[in-house]
């Protein structure tokens, strides 16, 4: 009969086969019987050979090692500490076998978790970030300063990232939300009272995402109405007043 090679029940190796047999026998991994496991393993290998299947050499090596370990179990041996187990391949012991099986099982379970995460990720689809410049009204691109709309967007993005990644260690207390008109008045009053401010410096406390968005929109509207102007200042943006009276705000 022509010899051919098969993957025995999709086992990845001798340790995988051993785990399968231990699970089938419902034996505690920490309290395995070397004699029973060896008999089951050798019987499985012999069955494969009886079918004239090409058994990988690593399975045969494990069979020989288990038989050697079984014979050693018949002799009185000293109790071995799990924390100081000799290499199983160099000096086969029951504790060494258990340790190898435990490590292999841990890797196998981790591989299964990663496989599940990979399959879940394949069901997700990434989306490229939108170009917000396409929504800009060409008639409102003059911001009465040395900044472009994209500069303001970059400043907003920096602040948004700070909000997203900063860890809040104190208890969160929800602040009263403001409308766009109310925030415009609040921003303009702050700029007038402080004779200017920076975009980051305006937030005396850690803002929420909602507060950050409405504040950014308020700044855009105030710039559009020529109430405040924006100027580049290092990595921040300087806001300064362009009108003398606060009541000139068109809200």
UniProtKB/Swiss-Prot annotation:
Gene3D superfamilies: 6.10.250.2410
Entry-linked InterPro entries: ScpA
Subcellular location(s) of the protein: Cytoplasm
GO cellular component: cytoplasm
Chief localisation class: cytoplasm
Keywords: Cell cycle, Cell division, Chromosome partition, Cytoplasm
Keyword Cell cycle: yes
Cell cycle as UniProt keyword: yes
GO biological process, one term: DNA replication
Parts of the chain that traverse the membrane: none
Pfam families, per the entry: SMC_ScpA (PF02616)
Subunit structure of this chain's protein: Component of a cohesin-like complex composed of ScpA, ScpB and the Smc homodimer, in which ScpA and ScpB bind to the head domain of Smc. The presence of the three proteins is required for the association of the complex with DNA.
Job of this protein: Participates in chromosomal partition during cell division. May act via the formation of a condensin-like complex containing Smc and ScpB that pull DNA away from mid-cell into both cell halves.
Recorded family membership: Belongs to the ScpA family.
Protein name: Segregation and condensation protein A
Organism the protein comes from: Exiguobacterium sibiricum (strain DSM 17290 / CCUG 55495 / CIP 109462 / JCM 13490 / 255-15)
């Amino acid at each position: 009969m022509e010899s051919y090679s098969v993957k025995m029940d999709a086992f990845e190796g001798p340790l995988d086969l051993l785990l399968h047999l231990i699970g089938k026998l419902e034996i505690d991994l920490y309290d395995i019987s070397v004699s029973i496991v060896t008999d089951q393993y050798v019987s499985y290998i012999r069955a494969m050979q009886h079918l004239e299947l090409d058994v990988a050499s690593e399975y045969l090596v494990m069979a020989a090692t288990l038989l050697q370990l079984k014979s050693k179990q018949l002799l009185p041996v000293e109790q071995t500490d799990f924390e100081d187990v000799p290499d199983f391949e160099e000096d086969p012991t029951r504790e060494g076998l258990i340790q190898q099986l435990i490590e292999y099982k841990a890797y196998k379970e981790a591989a299964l978790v990663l496989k599940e995460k990979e399959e879940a990720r394949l069901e997700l689809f990434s989306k490229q970030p939108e170009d917000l410049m396409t929504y800009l009204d060409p008639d409102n691109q003059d911001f009465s300063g040395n900044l472009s709309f994209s500069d303001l967007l970059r400043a907003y993005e920096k602040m948004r990232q700070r909000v997203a990644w900063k860890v809040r260690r104190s208890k969160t207390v929800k602040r009263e939300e403001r409308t766009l008109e109310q925030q415009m008045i609040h921003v303009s009053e702050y700029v007038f009272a402080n004779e200017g401010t920076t975009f980051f410096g305006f937030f005396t406390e850690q803002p929420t995402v909602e507060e950050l968005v409405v504040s950014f929109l308020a700044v855009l509207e105030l710039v559009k109405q020529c109430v405040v102007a924006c100027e580049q200042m290092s990595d921040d943006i300087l806001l300064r007043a362009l009108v003398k009276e606060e009541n000139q705000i068109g809200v």
